[in-house]
Amino acid sequence: MTIDSYFASLPDGFASIEQMRDLLPAPVQKVTFVGVAGTAGKTAVAAFLAATLHAQGIRTGLYHAGCEPLAKRIRIDGAPVDEGLLSLTAQALSAAEPLPRDAAELTAAARCFGEAGCTLAVVELPDAGLAAALPQMPVCAVTAVGPLLLYYF
């Protein structure tokens, strides 16, 4: 089974915060996360923020949700995650009770960031409720693009 087929086989739905936290090993606890949530513009905001942090010399992880292969959506210092590291992460997750797909992908990204020694990681949140599972998330950027802005301003 390939990495992508493993994640594609996972169910939709919601994971408990405790279930996700149980799958985050010690190295993940050292990473500070910045979540990006909202209706539109998440990918651009997350990529810009990660590039800015990396340009300042900070070892930075980036995860964005989407339909590309997961190995392309998890990045460390601007480069796609090492396939070997992602494979080890997928093996560890497959040994546990299955998480829903969005939660499993975010957990895999967090594990990769911890193992790669990232100081900061910018994560696009497919579900803002997943933010509570990640350790050290002092800030969450929220994007809102569209007619909603006219209502509030």
Tell where the protein language model's regions lie, with residue ranges.
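Compositionally biased, intrinsically disordered low-complexity regions enriched in proline and serine
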Residues: 7, 152-153
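Short alpha-helical patches at coil-to-helix transitions and adjacent helical residues
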Residues: 42, 46, 103-106
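ATP-dependent carboxylate-amine ligase catalytic core
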Residues: 21-29, 52-140, 144-152
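Ser/Thr-glycine-rich phosphate-binding loops at phosphate-binding pockets of nucleotides
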Residues: 36-39, 43-45, 137, 143-146
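Short functional linear segments
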Residues: 1-38, 45, 51, 55-56, ...
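Conserved strand-to-helix beginnings and helix N-cap segments that scaffold or border functional pockets
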Residues: 46-47, 153
